[in-house]
């Protein structure tokens, strides 16, 4: 009697786990594969580029972001495979730098594609890392809007701000070193655009 009850309970638990792990729509499966693949590509890129980094500040950013992304990857994959809450919840990435941008353009040499792999430098590496973070953020945003599994949707949606934060940190690094210049409109044009909209208070009843 007790053995039969145990077998039945075990079978029910197995069916429950299978139902959760298979609780995914077709669009979700395709978008999640693309998003996870994008995360892997970014991590692989960091591993390849790391030995070429010269600046210790950039090396610190690369290591910190890679280690955080590793945990994020495991959390996403676990929730995707099981359909359950992951054993390690989504973390929050904390930048280790300020958030001040330098505005304005300084003339410099025109940019052009590299002719030789030996031309790799910190400007190019930080650009590759920034592009990877932007790519992951875009893929996960698309995946979150197509996801039917509630756990996976929440985990992916909660991970997007971390990708944005990591991309922001890299853009600050690039701006600081003159790799990523930020132009501005004139003060008059800025005021015109800032005042182009106003708040409203007309809710539906």
Residue map of PLM features:
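Leu/Val/Ala/Ile-rich N-terminal alpha-helices, chiefly Sec-type signal peptides and the beginnings
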Residues: 1-43, 50-53
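Residue-identity detector for glutamine
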Residues: 3, 13, 18-19, 45, ...
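Conserved alpha-helical segments that form or flank metal/cofactor-binding pockets of metalloenzymes
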Residues: 6, 56-104, 167-177
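Carboxylate-rich helix-loop segments that flank metal/cofactor sites and access channels
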Residues: 9-15, 82-126, 183-203
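Acidic/histidine-rich alpha-helical segments that form the ligand environment
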Residues: 27-50, 104-158, 166
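Short, surface-exposed linear patches
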Residues: 55, 149-152, 196
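Hydrophobic alpha-helical segments
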Residues: 69, 162-163, 192
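A contiguous, mid-protein "functional segment" used to position or interact
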Residues: 149-185
